[in-house]
Amino acid sequence: MKKLSQSEQKSLVARFAIDTLIEQKKIFSGMKIGLGTGSTAMPAVQRLAERIADGTLKDIKAVVTSFQTANACEEFGIPVYSLNDKAIGGKLDLAIDGADEIAPDKSVIKGGGAALLREKIVEYNAKTFVVIGDSSKAVQSLGTKFPLPVEIIADARVPVQKAIEKLGGKCVLREGVKKAGPVITDNGNQILDVLWEKPVDPKAMEKKLNEIVGVVENGFFTKNRPIVFVATQDGRVRSL
């Protein structure tokens, strides 16, 4: 049997998740849905648009986490709102997004696409959080192989880096691709990518990092235990 590529797994899990959540009546007409960012979230946005187009879903209100997702929603005809809009009222019924790493306890790392702040705002204000990923995303411990993104104020980079190093992290300023200089987030900030020499407690470290002056947000997501769907190379989708 041919093994699915990473891209094929992402498409599979995105479509499976949307269709399964509709069947389970966890996604239905009239919902306020947060939509994530990145190569796994985009197929989910597309599948949601297809289920709107075929009449399965109506009156879906989307809140997005990046310019990328806003552009996709515009292309697919999904109305986009802000959490501040009266129609949304600061709370979402459900949010769906990919992840960079998923631990057995369902804590995750997000922010590989530099949208972690907006992703956390949206997903921490959703009643239900859904995470989708390919087989490479399931790991035993977070942040020892894939770096943890930490969004920082540019003028605080050196003191923030020193503070994180005292906690056991090794920091690298994320550089732009096809752009000279560092990555600039949609919020005008910079990203430190942090690798941990030893496994850390994500919940405790999420709090510690955000206590450092100059840190805007970090990519540990531990507040909600999400519904998790992970695709496998042999074409199955499993729930964690």
Positions of predicted regions on the chain:
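N-terminal, positively charged regions that mediate nucleic acid binding
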Residues: 18, 36, 61-64
